[in-house]
Amino acid sequence: MMRQLFVLLSLSILLSGSHINIKKEYFSTLNTQNSSAVIEMRYFGSNNFLGRQVQGYKAPICYLSNEATSALKKVEIALKKEQLRLVIFDCYRPQRAVDDFVLWAKKLNDTKMKDIYYPQVQKKDLFKEGYIAAKSGHSRGSTIDLSISTLDMGTPFDYFDPRSHTMSPKVTPAQLKNRLYLKKVMEDNGFKNYPKEWWHYTLKNEPFPKKYFDFVIE
């Protein structure tokens, strides 16, 4: 209890100062020097459902809480034994990026990426169907979107469709097997899956379950 109070007090002090200190103290970065994963930060570029760079992404950097980073390295070790590696699509996500998603979703005439990312869903229904929300676990720093390189998961990342549900019966047996393999290796190392997105995992014992950060990725 005393340790938790100390951490919360320290965090509140940091929040009143520089976001740089928060990153250094509580977050780590994954890169080619310390990770075997392919870092493919989709929201830094235009290969995403908005079709453009998202607010808050000024660099293609993967930030995760120190605890999530440690757990993910165990996943990498397990996959390396099978000559496999992760592909990472998104990590920590600033709250301003989530706000950007919300504003985009309200612009019903902007549908240039519909055929790729949400062909079966009307844009006006993205909130109702739960594909867009005002808050995201990614902003807490211990959620990651990923896949396994070379394995077919049945849908692209961020595909707004029931086929993206982890246990969807609409994918092939081989694709479901790949999803379950990813699920097992992630769960074995402390993560839990969001059932509506095969790529979405959160550290079970995340250090900041109620805190939504907003420092820019740079």
Short names for language-model regions:
Residues 4-14:
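Sec-dependent N-terminal signal peptides
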